[in-house]
């Protein structure tokens, strides 16, 4: 069976306060806005992956819970991201932590409107090849 010819991924997250969510994505995480649809704003997280912030009243889904998704951002600058989040006043549910068994740095925090976010950096050489292919 042939693989789908997938070129990217967008995760859409639904918000009651779209401007506050957009401020978080742009000014806290530092993500560039690549598509403004008015009620949906799409931010680039890597060359072919994106996060979309959607006005809950206009989106295609009737998102009723915020604890059904964990948005995990794979970074190559974990310590810098930690400091950026600290400077923005975020508290961490978990971490920052180094997992000896997984060979990752990880931290979790609650973002806008109660959504859970994880920031992680893979440290094992084999996993770095998988998750950081553009750094070769």
Where in the sequence are the language-model features?
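N-terminal beta-strand motif that seeds the catalytic metal site of vicinal oxygen chelate
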Residues: 1-22, 69-73, 123-136
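Residue-level preference for beta-strand/loop junctions
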Residues: 7, 65-67, 101
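Short, conserved charged micro-motifs
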Residues: 20-21, 78-82
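Conserved active-site tyrosine of GNAT-family acetyltransferases
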Residues: 21-26, 85, 114
């Amino acid at each position: 069976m042939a693989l789908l010819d997938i070129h990217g991924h967008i995760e859409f997250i639904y918000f009651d306060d779209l401007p506050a969510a957009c401020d978080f994505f742009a000014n806290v995480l530092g993500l560039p806005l690549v598509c403004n649809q008015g009620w949906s704003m799409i931010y680039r997280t890597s060359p072919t992956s994106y996060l979309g912030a959607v006005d809950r009243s206009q989106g295609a889904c009737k998102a009723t819970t915020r604890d059904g998704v964990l948005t995990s951002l794979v970074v190559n600058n974990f310590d810098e991201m930690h400091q950026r989040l600290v400077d923005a006043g975020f508290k961490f549910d978990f971490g920052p932590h180094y997992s000896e068994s997984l060979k990752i740095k990880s931290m979790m925090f609650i973002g806008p409107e109660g959504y859970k976010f994880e920031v992680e950096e893979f440290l094992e050489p084999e996993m770095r090849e998988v998750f950081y292919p553009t750094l070769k």
